[in-house]
Amino acid sequence: MSQTWLTAHDDEPMRGLPAPLPAAETLLWQGSPDPLSLAQRAYGVRAVAIYFFLLLALRLAEAGSGELAMNGWMAELVPTVVLAGCATALLGLLAWLNARETLYTLTDKRLVLRFGVALPMTVNIPLTRVEAADLRLYRDGTGDIAFRLSRPERVSWLVFWPHVRPWQWTRPQPCLRGIRNPARVAELLREAAAADSGIPGSA
């Protein structure tokens, strides 16, 4: 597994790749995270919105019970509403930027993850280094595909986030987050891995 640090995507010899594909390698699929899916499941926009909603409901309940004076509860609510709007907007913007700068590439030999807003990075993961792939589907039609790497291969959770499987800190797993048509991508991955060396596990 190799890592290549890039300064600009405009310099890519082939979109999403640090170098042109060898003649014997075939491009199977390219895609990016869905911004809404990434915002909800990686950046926690929904959880933050629910938190502020409950906080506002509590403030309104206190106002209705007379614990806050009428001229005081508005002063309590307005900053909370503004903070809620700023927090969700900021997280949504970060998710959108991350999705825009991310490109996942699958060939018949490897996976290539290009990601990073401030510091773009490209990572090549040969299919022969993948022990298993796990597919998770969501009701909005998007999904995640996480990869368990063979030892001693490791990735940094901090460097790869949010392109890692959630809650896997001790042995982080690279993950295609919030991709559209994930079942089809998983099938392409299964076929490519089977043709290359075989990949046990689910996808």
Model-derived features with residue positions:
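Long, distal/terminal scaffolding or interaction modules
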Residues: 23, 53-54, 124
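Conserved beta-hairpin
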Residues: 87-132
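Alpha-helical transmembrane spans
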Residues: 36-101
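A membrane-cytosol interface segment of integral membrane proteins
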Residues: 2-4, 139-203
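Residue-level signature of catalytic and energy-coupling elements of molecular machines
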Residues: 29, 111, 185
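Short, charged cytosolic
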Residues: 2-31
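Flexible glycine-/small-residue-rich
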Residues: 31, 108, 149-151
